[in-house]
Amino acid sequence: MATNRVFELRNWVYVSAALGLAGCTTVGPDYKQPMAPQVAGYTTQALPAQTAATSGMALGGSQRFVAGQAVSAQWWESFGSAKLNALIEQGLQASPSLAAAQATLRQAQQSYAAQAGSSLYPQVDANLGALRQRTNNSGFGQSGGEHIFDLYNAGVKVSYNLDLFGGNRRALEALAAQADYQRYQLEGARQTLAGNIATAAMAQAQYAAQISATEAILGAQQSQVDIAHKRFTLGAIARGDELSLLTQLEQTRASLPPLRNQLQQTNHLLAVLVGEAPGAATIPQFSLSDFTLPADVPLLVPSELVRQRPDIQASEALLRAANAEYGVAISKSYPQINLSATLGSQALSTSSLFGPGSIIWSLVSQLAQPLFNGGLKAGVNSAQASFDAAAANYQQSVLQGLRNVADVLRALDNGAETLQAQAAANNAAEASLKLVQQQYLLGGLSYLQLLTAQQQAQQTRVNLVAAQARRLTDTAALYQAMGGGWRSNEE
């Protein structure tokens, strides 16, 4: 008999839930994906098919823009540096910022799972209780005096919320979108970390090369000062000429500490990026010769870019969440129906539990319909405003992404031309310095002309190194601007 009642109650709850779901509707608008950017290119002026080339110059090769080329998930490997590859992999494994992003993603996923478990399925709870009580019949005008008895109960309660108007489902949509947002944030953090390590390694190589170039110039200037001192001792030149050359020497020497400081700070940055303390890290030393310049670089069309950039995808996830929250706000104006059933046993002894005459049960259905609640309309309006803000933020993220790509593409094109010009300037400055030094030693030119030639040679050499490094960092920035290829791991 008790078993039959269990089946009856269980079937009643499941059938009621099934009937409720069959008649469910989901209030609020269904999400519609925004249109892709309706533009063919990133800049008003068409890009050349490839960048300028500087023959005979390291990192001076031409780069070809390949339309539609997929971005590799390990795009940093295109620079051909095993040291860089190892450092980035170390950072991806050990970075605390990535660990925090991963934990936040797990939190969002578990929030969704918790809500799904309580919204989609009936809740089943078991209870077991024991009571010992004394009563005094004389207090009720009855004979018999006091009476002590035990009461035991055990039972199961099943409850279910009929989501007739989809409020729970919209809430799940919002939580799923929030989990997606955190997933895209994690992917964005990975790409940012890889990009920061790559550009920091390239900056380290740049500063090291500029220090080396400056030290070479410093050595040449020291030789000129030594010669000038001998000539002054012999009375061939005035003391002022010697002091002018010495001033130039010390000015060149003074430019070294700032470069060393930049190099050291870059090493500290690299240590933190790979999850180590600056004082305990062993950071590899990079040179510009450690890197190769990719000959082919990807160029996605704008309509595909929005799918590839994690920041744009994260912004769209927030838009989906806002759309779902709008549906949740609307659903609060509709009836809420809750069903519950209880089956149990109550007896004066444990041996009598679930015996004849001990079974108790209940069936309950509750309907709540808001009749007057001034806050509901305001809640809907608030959710609508939140959706409008999310839509505007999404459009802004798309525009920022397009601008980012446009800036990097122009930087690549102009950077190649800059290197070409800097290489020519450096060749001319070095040739001029050699000629001026020879003529100065022969007495044909003044020390002022020598100083000018030295200054030009120093500055053009430093600028040349910066232009070489800039081609590397601009290329890394393009890979990031194109989304970093993170979807390659998904697909």
Predicted regions and their residues:
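Transmembrane beta-barrel architecture of outer-membrane proteins
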Residues: 26, 84-86, 151-153, 199, ...
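A short glycine-centered flexible hinge/capping loop motif at secondary-structure junctions
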Residues: 232-236, 440-444, 481-485
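Outer membrane beta-barrel translocator domains of Type V secretion systems
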Residues: 123-161, 167-178, 182-184
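Sec/SRP-type N-terminal targeting helices
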Residues: 99-100, 162-190, 240, 244, ...
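Membrane-embedded beta-strand positions in outer-membrane beta-barrel channels/transporters
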Residues: 88, 153-157, 201, 302, ...
